[in-house]
Amino acid sequence: QEGDPEAGAKAFNQCQTCHVIVDDSGTTIAGRNAKTGPNLYGVVGRTAGTQADFKGYGEGMKEAGAKGLAWDEEHFVQYVQDPTKFLKEYTGDAKAKGKMTFKLKKEADAHNIWAYLQQVAVRP
């Protein structure tokens, strides 16, 4: 499914409670200085659990990154709809849990947010 970045910008409002998009120069692209979750600038293609300034990753996310998870659309869409289920399946660890408690209800929103992130959050 092809995402719509404009719809993704609107849907990203749901993410701003916990996430920001702040580029390497410190310019805020989206969000309101939230620190609960990692900065999503550079998330496209990034190994899971490796955003340098964020220290709050759970063990399940770190394990997924160690097992090779790099964020692409397919994995992002699955993860944001049910983080704990995704991490259990990806890592093969029945005890893995996602620290992200929010679940995005609509798959279309997930595709749209990914399209938005591809537009504004990719490192040049």
From Swiss-Prot:
Belongs to the cytochrome c family. Its main location: periplasm. Keywords: Electron transport, Heme, Iron, Metal-binding, Periplasm, Photosynthesis, Pyrrolidone carboxylic acid, Transport. One of its GO terms (molecular function) is heme binding. Cytochrome c2 is found mainly in purple, non-sulfur, photosynthetic bacteria where it functions as the electron donor to the oxidized bacteriochlorophyll in the photophosphorylation pathway. However, it may also have a role in the respiratory chain and is found in some non-photosynthetic bacteria. It comes from Cereibacter sphaeroides (Rhodobacter sphaeroides). The modification Pyrrolidone carboxylic acid is found at residue 1. GO terms for cellular component: periplasmic space. One of its GO terms (biological process) is photosynthesis. It is found in: Periplasm. Heme c binds at residues 15, 18-19, 100. PANTHER family: CYTOCHROME C. The gene is cycA. Binds 1 heme c group covalently per subunit. InterPro entries: Cyt_c-like_dom (IPR009056), Cyt_c-like_dom_sf (IPR036909), Cyt_c_1A/1B (IPR002327). This is Cytochrome c2.
